[in-house]
Amino acid sequence: DLHAKFWGRAEGQFPGMMQINTSYIEPFMPGVEGTWRNCIAQFGYCMTPDVIEAMPRYVAGLRDIMRRNGDRTMTLIHGDVRVDNVMFGDGKPGLAPVVMLDWQAIMVSNPMQDLAWLLNSGFDTELRRKHEDEFLAYYCERLAVAGVSGYSVNQARDDYDLGLDRKST
């Protein structure tokens, strides 16, 4: 319910918080570029020249994707929802069913980034693809129960694809 609570108003409630389309992009890019250079230095021997030459285009595309994430309805997101940052309870009364860890990447962004990262880190590709539409529909249902209106499964799918960096130009 984190996303629903701040849906469309997180920017105003957290004006100093990092935002995907403004304060996050430029500080993040040197890390991407440095990681890419290190990867080429250590593993370049097994990469084709076209992969090695793709770095500038990838970085430019990633900047664009981050900006476009900020053009969506934004809310407060965890920013690093992976299976290893989630603890699942055992269903006993009084225990939280899910606890999120590692809040260092919290920001204001497209909420589907969180869902995209979780589903892609927690399921094998075939299983995820088979049930993605169900997950997105359930997410939209939960938003509606929490008072968010007008967010369709089609919009969720579009935002989800962008959150996965699958909507590059």
Residue spans for each PLM region:
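Active-site activation/catalytic loop segments of kinase-like enzymes and analogous catalytic loops
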Residues: 105-148, 166-168
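Generic, well-ordered alpha-helical scaffold segments in large soluble proteins
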Residues: 2-6, 61, 80, 84, ...
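Active-site-proximal structural scaffolding
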Residues: 70, 74, 79, 108-111, ...
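ATP-dependent phospho-/nucleotidyl transfer catalytic cores
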Residues: 1-78, 89-94
